[in-house]
C-alpha cells in the first residue's frame, strides 16, 4: 500500500472515531422540533425555543417570564408525569399529522407514546398561540429565574 493511501485511511478512521463520540439527539427532541414547526407554520425555528426564559430548554426553575415560558413549564411537567408512569419521553417517537390547523396525534395506541405525543402537540400549539419576546431569549437564569 502506498503511504498516501495509508494517510487517507488513517484520516478516515480518526474522523469516524470522532463522530462516534458525539452523542446523538434523542429522537423525540428531533420529532418535537418538527411538531413545533408544524404548529407555527414555519414562522419560527424550533431552535428559538431551546434557550428561552426559565423553562424552555434543559432544566427549568423559578417563575416563568411570560406565557410562552409557561408553555415550556407545562411541557416539562407533562414529561414529568409521563416519567412517573414509567415512560421515557425524550426517547419515544409517535405518529402525528400536520394539518392546516396544526399538529395532531394520529393512531398512537401505546400509552407512553400517546402521553408524549399529547405533551408535545399541546406545547407546540401553546407556543404558536403566544407571543415570542426576543428579550427573553438566552437570559441570565441565575438572576431572572428565582
UniProtKB/Swiss-Prot annotation:
Its EC number is 3.1.1.4. Ca(2+) binds at residues 55, 57, 59, 76. Keywords: Calcium, Disulfide bond, Hydrolase, Lipid degradation, Lipid metabolism, Metal-binding, Neurotoxin, Presynaptic neurotoxin, Secreted, Signal, Toxin. The keyword Cytoplasm does not apply. GO terms for molecular function: calcium ion binding; calcium-dependent phospholipase A2 activity; phospholipid binding; toxin activity. GO terms for cellular component: extracellular region. Expressed by the venom gland. Residues 1-21 form the signal peptide. GO terms for biological process: arachidonate secretion; lipid catabolic process; phospholipid metabolic process. The keyword Electron transport does not apply. It is found in: Secreted. Residues 22-27 form a propeptide. Disulfide bonds join 38-98, 54-145, 56-72, 71-126, 78-119, 87-112, 105-117. Its cofactor is Ca(2+). It catalyses: a 1,2-diacyl-sn-glycero-3-phosphocholine + H2O = a 1-acyl-sn-glycero-3-phosphocholine + a fatty acid + H(+). The active site is at 75, 120. Snake venom phospholipase A2 (PLA2) that inhibits neuromuscular transmission by blocking acetylcholine release from the nerve termini. PLA2 catalyzes the calcium-dependent hydrolysis of the 2-acyl groups in 3-sn-phosphoglycerides. PANTHER family: PHOSPHOLIPASE A2 A2-ACTITOXIN-UCS2A-LIKE (PTHR11716:SF106), PHOSPHOLIPASE A2 FAMILY MEMBER (PTHR11716). Belongs to the phospholipase A2 family. Group I subfamily. D49 sub-subfamily. This is Basic phospholipase A2. It comes from Hydrophis hardwickii (Hardwick's spine-bellied seasnake). The lineage of its organism: Eukaryota, Metazoa, Chordata, Craniata, Vertebrata.
Amino acid at each position: 500500500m502506498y503511504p498516501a493511501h495509508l494517510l487517507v485511511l488513517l484520516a478516515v478512521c480518526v474522523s469516524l472515531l470522532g463522530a462516534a463520540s458525539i452523542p446523538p439527539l434523542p429522537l423525540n427532541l428531533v420529532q418535537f422540533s418538527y411538531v413545533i414547526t408544524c404548529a407555527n407554520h414555519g414562522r419560527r425555528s424550533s431552535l428559538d425555543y431551546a434557550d428561552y426564559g426559565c423553562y424552555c430548554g434543559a432544566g427549568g426553575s423559578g417563575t416563568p417570564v411570560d406565557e410562552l415560558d409557561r408553555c415550556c413549564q407545562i411541557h416539562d411537567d407533562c414529561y414529568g408525569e409521563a416519567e412517573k408512569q414509567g415512560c421515557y419521553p425524550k426517547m419515544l417517537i409517535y405518529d402525528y399529522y400536520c394539518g392546516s390547523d396544526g399538529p395532531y396525534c394520529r393512531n398512537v395506541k401505546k400509552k407512553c407514546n400517546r402521553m408524549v405525543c399529547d405533551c408535545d402537540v399541546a406545547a407546540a400549539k401553546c407556543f404558536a398561540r403566544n407571543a415570542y419576546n426576543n428579550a427573553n431569549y438566552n437570559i441570565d437564569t441565575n438572576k431572572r429565574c428565582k
